[in-house]
């Protein structure tokens, strides 16, 4: 009996110790890995860069086989994508199954693929054909995953622009555009039925760019500020991104889908822009992305006021500066890294030894606004990898619209929201 009692006591002690040691948060940071460049490093060389910023998740805009193979047995979680041009084909479950067998199954289970996005910001494009095909394509891919026995492992979703909101201030008054509800509601029902995440691309940068005199810079950069209070809930917000996220949650609740979980599929800040792209500087990019990553990784602030029990899932845009992306200068300068593996700017914290040692930054150079005297030698020899046919879909679904209409539409909404936010600063 004494031995049994001893074992019981020891077991209770170990359980208690485990509860103390194990982290209580499941929050992690992800990064968007775009490939629109002719000077990008090989996927194998990319792995240490992703790990150096603490990212455990990667979002692709395609299903590039070279990348998926290179990341096998790394444990890094992947979202892969089907471009807008695939929507009409994916309506057919048999064609979707063929795509799954060619682009997903060969890499499992070594590569941790957990989600497939169907198109990007479709409802903001005002394209009736794409809008009509979106849900059937999502259903077709989900049906194919069921047939392949992968539906429990891999979810299906699509990413939306923040412009699908009619109102977003105060956050409690978040509401979807009425003219989108006929298309959006069945998609939300699909999410509820399949337990897949609702993805939003959110860029506070455009709010500041649109009206830098009215929008408090500290509020959008996660810097210390007085913040705002939602008069309906009493919740305090000290950054715009969290206010935007809760506005989306409020819109979902108003539409009858309170239980859906929101993930931020894109957010970021460019380090360079054209003359009219106010705020696109290395210092602001450092503060936005650096503060966001530090905040998420520290676990100190990983939930929004409206959803205190929901850990955030956020994907930073983007991993590299991509020299072949169309659009304004900023579109080619969202990267955390240059193609040679050096930092595009300091993030304000030390990276791991792989990058820190190669760049010569140490911990001392990590706090300079633009890298200071940091050694600019490449982390690894650049072996240009031009985008192949598997990557061309990214041109159609990247954060950079060729026409500029999509982000312009989102920027107008963000501007209205930000002006209201500025007027309510305490």
UniProtKB/Swiss-Prot annotation:
Signal peptide: 1-30
Keyword line: Cell membrane, Cell wall, Cell wall biogenesis/degradation, Glycoprotein, Glycosidase, GPI-anchor, Hydrolase, Lipoprotein, Membrane, Plant defense, Secreted, Signal
Sites where a glycan is attached: 112, 126, 367
One GO cellular component term: plasma membrane
InterPro entries per the UniProt record, alphabetical: Glyco_hydro_17, Glyco_hydro_17_plant, Glycoside_hydrolase_SF
Region called Disordered, residue ranges: 360-389
Keyword Transcription regulation found: no
GO BP: carbohydrate metabolic process; cell wall organization; defense response
Localization, UniProt: Secreted, Cell wall; Cell membrane
One Pfam family matching this protein: Glyco_hydro_17
Proregion residues excised on maturation: 399-426
Comp. bias intervals (Gly residues): 360-372
Family label: Belongs to the glycosyl hydrolase 17 family.
Active site as annotated: 121, 266
Catalysed reaction, written as an equation: Hydrolysis of (1->3)-beta-D-glucosidic linkages in (1->3)-beta-D-glucans
Biological source species: Arabidopsis thaliana
Molecular function via GO: glucan endo-1,3-beta-D-glucosidase activity
Name assigned to this protein: Glucan endo-1,3-beta-glucosidase 11
EC number(s) reported in the record: 3.2.1.39
Membrane topology field: Lipid-anchor; GPI-anchor
């Amino acid at each position: 009996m004494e031995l049994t009692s001893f074992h019981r006591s020891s077991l209770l002690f170990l359980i208690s110790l485990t509860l103390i040691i194990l982290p209580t948060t499941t929050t992690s940071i992800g990064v968007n890995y775009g490939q629109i460049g002719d000077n990008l490093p090989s996927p194998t060389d990319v792995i240490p860069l992703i790990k150096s910023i603490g990212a455990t998740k990667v979002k692709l805009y395609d299903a590039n086989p070279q990348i998926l193979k290179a990341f096998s047995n790394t444990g890094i979680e992947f979202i892969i994508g089907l471009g807008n041009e695939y929507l009409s084909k994916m309506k057919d479950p048999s064609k979707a199954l063929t795509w799954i067998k060619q682009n997903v199954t060969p890499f499992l289970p070594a590569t941790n693929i957990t989600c497939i996005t169907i198109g990007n910001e479709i409802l903001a494009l005002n394209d009736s054909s794409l809008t009509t095909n979106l849900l059937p394509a999502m259903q077709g891919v989900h049906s194919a995953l069921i047939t392949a026995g992968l539906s429990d492992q891999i979810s299906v979703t699509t990413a939306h622009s923040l412009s699908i909101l009619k109102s977003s201030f105060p956050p409690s008054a978040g509401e979807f555009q009425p003219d989108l509800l006929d298309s959006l509601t069945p998609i939300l029902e699909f999410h509820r039925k399949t337990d897949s995440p609702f993805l939003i691309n959110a860029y506070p940068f455009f709010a500041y760019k649109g009206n830098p005199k009215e929008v408090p810079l500290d509020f959008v950069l996660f810097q210390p500020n007085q913040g705002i209070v939602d008069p309906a809930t009493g919740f305090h917000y000290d950054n715009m991104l969290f206010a935007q996220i809760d506005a989306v949650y409020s819109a979902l609740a108003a539409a009858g889908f309170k239980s859906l979980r929101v993930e931020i599929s894109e957010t970021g800040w460019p380090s360079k822009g054209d003359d009219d792209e106010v705020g696109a500087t290395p210092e602001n990019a450092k503060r936005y992305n650096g503060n966001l990553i530090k905040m998420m990784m520290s676990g100190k602030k990983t939930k929004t006021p409206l959803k205190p029990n929901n850990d955030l899932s956020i994907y930073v845009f983007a991993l590299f500066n991509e020299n072949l992306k169309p659009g304004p200068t900023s579109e080619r300068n969202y990267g955390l890294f240059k193609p040679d593996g050096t930092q595009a700017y300091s993030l304000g914290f030390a990276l791991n030894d792989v990058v820190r040692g190669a760049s010569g930054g140490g911990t001392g150079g990590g706090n300079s606004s633009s890298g200071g005297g940091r050694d600019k030698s490449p982390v690894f020899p650049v072996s240009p990898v031009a985008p192949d046919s598997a990557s061309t879909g990214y041109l159609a679904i990247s954060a950079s619209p060729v026409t500029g209409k999509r982000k312009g539409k989102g920027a107008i909404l963000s501007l209205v929201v930000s002006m209201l936010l500025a007027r309510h600063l305490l």
